[in-house]
Amino acid sequence: MEFDTIAAISTALGEGAIAIVRVSGEDAIEKVNRIFKGKDLTAVSSHTIHYGHIVDLDTNQVIEEVMVSIMRAPKTFTREDIVEVNCHGGLVSVNKVLQLILAQGVRLAEPGEFTKRAFLNGRIDLSQAEAVMDLIRAKTDRAMNVAINQMEGRLSKLIGRLRQEILETLAHVEVNIDYPEYDDVEEMTHRILIEKATHVQNEIEKILETSKQGKILREGIATAIIGRPNVGKSSLLNSLVQEKKAIVTDIAGTTRDVIEEYVNVRGVPLRLIDTAGIRETEDIVEQIGVERSKEMMSQADLVLIVVNYSEPLTNEDEELFRAVQGKDFIVIVNKTDLPQKIEMERVTELASEKRVITTSLIEEKGVDELEKAIADLFFEGTIESADMTYVSNARHIGLLTQARKTIGDAIAAIENGVPIDMVQIDLTRTWEILGEITGDTVHESLIDQLFSQFCLGK
């Protein structure tokens, strides 16, 4: 497949030691060579790097001192010729280099276009392409491992095997229908067809069983920290994040907005939301923060309720317990370094079967126990090995759910005595749905939509 030559800045914009301009396409080497003062890039070997300067042809002025990497097709990310110009990381210099390359008839790449070309040129499938973005956005080592496994094609191979099984079953059905007189072909009975379809259904179910943990590793657990003002919510956030992000004072109501931060808890990414203290208040700004806190609490996957060990429970405390019924929550009884005034029996009663953790955040006590409780709640204390294949992408989960339904429809039809040839419709639809995961049976509009979500230069 032939495309025009494209270029984009592949590194994050801003001041830094190095910036990279990536160029891909049939004419990439020749067009960069026009503005490169050094070796003749068209004559150098593949996968080599060369020192030189980028020159403005209009003024013959040296613009940048660079190192240029040459990678020749097909052994490149896009399976096209690729040039990467390594220059200094200032905004002006890297943009000037890009503009000089574009002036040679190169087009500015669209977001995700390099990865899109890798897909369209057959180097990776669609699920592997999506994993590239997951790797970039990974918040923990575990999330990174999930993305790498998908990039290496582990999910693709699982899906490929299932599609092959369905295809072989369809071929077997077809032969039985078209050539019933062949004695050397096994008869496709209802029993055999149910066995084959059930096996596919079970394999789809196994993959889907990893989706809850996979989605958590990919997207994180939305975790709201709630409680009355000055019970230690911001201190808890800072203890988990291990930096002073929130304002911690003795003045009630100092957290007037919602503060968010990602934190790695035993390999699980938590999207922590420190909310304004929930209480009745006349302060308009604080009221807005309180309302947003209630909204965040309703949307959270996990709620951490913080109460004060050194004060009796209030009606506001008890109202929080009632508000989180039906959600996953953990109770943190903070400030155990102060004299006890809270009734722990009442806390346990309000918490029902949920975990209650005592902490003294000022003395850094109880945080490890809290982290273990979170891991226990969502991963039963352990996370599978790095070699485990998870399905974490919402698009993949949706397609697998559809495939489970259509293969289930096929099994139900067989059990109800529907003619075997009629069952082909559901089997074929299952095969097509699974193909959408890897991009084998996907519409061009969806491809464009998926890659438009990528960052520029990737």
Swiss-Prot record:
Binding site for GTP: 230-235, 249-255, 274-277
Positions annotated to bind Mg(2+): 234, 255
Segments forming domain TrmE-type G: 220-379
UniProt GO BP: tRNA methylation; tRNA wobble uridine modification
Covalent S-S links between cysteines: none
EC number: 3.6.-.-
Enzymatic class: hydrolase
Residues binding (6S)-5-formyl-5,6,7,8-tetrahydrofolate: 22, 84, 123, 458
GO molecular function per UniProt: GTP binding; GTPase activity; metal ion binding
Annotated binding of K(+), by residue: 230, 249, 251, 254
UniProt entry keywords in alphabetical sequence: Cytoplasm, GTP-binding, Hydrolase, Magnesium, Metal-binding, Nucleotide-binding, Potassium, tRNA processing
Cofactor dependence: K(+)
GO cellular component: cytosol
Record's cofactor remark: Binds 1 potassium ion per subunit.
Annotated localization: Cytoplasm
InterPro entries: G_TrmE, GTP-bd, GTP-bd_TrmE_N, GTPase_MnmE, MnmE_dom2, MnmE_helical, P-loop_NTPase, Small_GTP-bd
Subunit structure, as described in the record: Homodimer. Heterotetramer of two MnmE and two MnmG subunits.
Main function: Exhibits a very high intrinsic GTPase hydrolysis rate. Involved in the addition of a carboxymethylaminomethyl (cmnm) group at the wobble position (U34) of certain tRNAs, forming tRNA-cmnm(5)s(2)U34.
HAMAP family named in the record: GTPase_MnmE
Family indicated by similarity: Belongs to the TRAFAC class TrmE-Era-EngA-EngB-Septin-like GTPase superfamily. TrmE GTPase family.
Protein name (record): tRNA modification GTPase MnmE
